[in-house]
């Protein structure tokens, strides 16, 4: 049986056993009600090491980034977001595989997790991912704060040892991922039981579908900051080429006009090149090109028409199914009435 290890300074760290964790949680809640935690005491001592190893999937990072970006677009300013982490835990090895959003309510100056919303979302995810369990929670920001400690206490009522993941979407660093992972422990600070964060190390674990998605995202960015996509870069290059072509054509046209007006001497080599340039486009007016062009237009129109017909058939199929369902219900009702008369 696992037991809680008690140091000489009476600092206790919650173990994985349910009885020990329940006792620790009750002690933490009782102490928090009597003596609020000091604002400056958030991180554990530098020599404190984590008790678990984390394997993080890229899908979680993309979910958090999408959540924060969507909230920023909706509200017009960056806002701190919260969500739940789900995955698998085997002993001291934790694999964070997915995540979902959490609804929060602001009561006074404190943020409170909506437990009803969490329970509803957990049931929905359990129906699809029955082998995934609640691991912890995520938020956004640069460093943990006292408010994060309060959220950690709330999450501890759901999971005895929750993991906190903090992502900084505003970071410009390209050397490493702007995220941190923490677990919590209870220690005595100035004679008071205090919840502190302990940094955790992590490794990235990917599956085939995630590797394809991450590779697609990486290819769609033209620089490390991700400000321009490949499509935008391609369009910019085309725009520059068209502008340059337009400028050169205007120069050639102005030269020919000046030669006709007698302002410049005629250069036969330049005139021959201009003549050859003007006769490049009419070459495409040959009957073979026209035939292929119209054939391709007909093919495109036929494909569009087939798509419209397919959509119409699909709508008709749904309509017939609903009609048959309604007809069967009415027939059953008539048969039931016939039994009583």
Swiss-Prot record:
Q: Name one Pfam family in it.
A: JAB
Specify where it is mainly localized. cytoplasm
Keywords tagged on the record: Cytoplasm, Developmental protein, Differentiation, Nucleus, Oogenesis, Signalosome
Q: Which InterPro entries match?
A: EIF3F/CSN6-like_C, JAMM/MPN+_dom, MPN, MPN_CSN6
PROSITE patterns to which the protein is assigned, alphabetical: MPN
Q: Which SMART domains match?
A: JAB_MPN
Region Disordered: start-end pairs:
1-43
Domain MPN: from-to ranges: 54-188
The compartments listed are:
Cytoplasm; Nucleus
GO MF annotations in UniProt: identical protein binding
For bias type Low complexity, the affected ranges are 11-27
Recorded GO CC terms: COP9 signalosome; cytoplasm
* Disulphide bond pairs: none
Q: Its GO biological process terms? A: female germ-line stem cell population maintenance; germ cell development; male germ-line cyst encapsulation; oogenesis; protein deneddylation; protein stabilization
Q: What else is known?
A: Although strongly related to metalloprotease proteins, it lacks the JAMM motif that probably constitutes the catalytic center. Its function as protease is therefore unsure.
Q: How does it assemble?
A: Component of the CSN complex, probably composed of CSN1b, alien/CSN2, CSN3, CSN4, CSN5, CSN6, CSN7 and CSN8.
Q: Which family does it belong to?
A: Belongs to the peptidase M67A family. CSN6 subfamily.
Its biological purpose is as follows: Component of the COP9 signalosome complex (CSN), a complex involved in various cellular and developmental processes. The CSN complex is an essential regulator of the ubiquitin (Ubl) conjugation pathway by mediating the deneddylation of the cullin subunits of the SCF-type E3 ligase complexes, leading to decrease the Ubl ligase activity of SCF. The CSN complex plays an essential role in oogenesis and embryogenesis and is required for proper photoreceptor R cell differentiation and promote lamina glial cell migration or axon targeting.
Q: What protein name does the entry list?
A: COP9 signalosome complex subunit 6
Source organism (scientific name): Drosophila melanogaster (Fruit fly)
**UniProt gene name:** CSN6
């Amino acid at each position: 049986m696992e037991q809680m290890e008690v140091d000489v300074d009476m600092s206790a760290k919650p173990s994985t056993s349910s009885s020990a964790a329940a006792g620790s949680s009750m002690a933490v809640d009782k102490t928090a009600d009597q003596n609020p935690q000091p604002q400056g005491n958030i991180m554990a001592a530098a020599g404190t090491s984590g008790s678990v190893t984390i394997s993080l999937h890229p899908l979680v990072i993309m979910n958090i980034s999408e959540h924060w970006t969507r909230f920023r677009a909706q509200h017009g300013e960056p806002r701190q977001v919260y969500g739940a982490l789900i995955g698998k835990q085997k002993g001291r090895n934790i694999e964070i595989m997915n995540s979902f959003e959490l609804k929060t309510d602001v009561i006074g100056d404190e943020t409170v997790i909506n437990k009803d919303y969490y329970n509803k979302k957990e049931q929905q995810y359990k129906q699809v991912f029955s082998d995934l369990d609640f691991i912890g929670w995520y938020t956004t920001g640069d460093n943990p704060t006292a408010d994060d400690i309060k959220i950690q206490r709330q999450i501890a009522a759901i999971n005895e040892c929750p993991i906190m993941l903090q992502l900084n979407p505003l970071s410009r660093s390209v050397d490493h991922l702007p995220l941190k992972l923490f677990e919590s422990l209870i220690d005595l600070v100035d004679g008071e039981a205090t919840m502190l964060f302990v940094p955790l190390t992590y490794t990235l674990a990917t599956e085939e579908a995630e590797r394809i998605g991450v590779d697609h995202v990486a290819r769609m960015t033209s620089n490390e900051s991700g400000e321009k996509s490949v499509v935008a870069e391609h369009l910019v290059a085309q725009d520059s080429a068209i502008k340059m072509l337009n400028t050169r054509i205007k120069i050639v046209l102005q030269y020919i006009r000046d030669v006709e007006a007698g302002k410049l001497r005629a250069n036969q080599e330049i005139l021959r090149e201009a003549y050859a340039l003007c006769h490049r486009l009419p070459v495409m007016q040959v009957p073979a090109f026209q035939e292929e062009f119209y054939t391709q237009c007909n093919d495109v129109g036929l494909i569009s028409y087939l798509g419209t017909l397919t959509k119409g058939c699909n709508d008709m199929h749904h309509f017939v199914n609903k009609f048959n369902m309604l007809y069967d219900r009415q027939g059953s009702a008539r048969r039931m009435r016939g039994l009583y008369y």
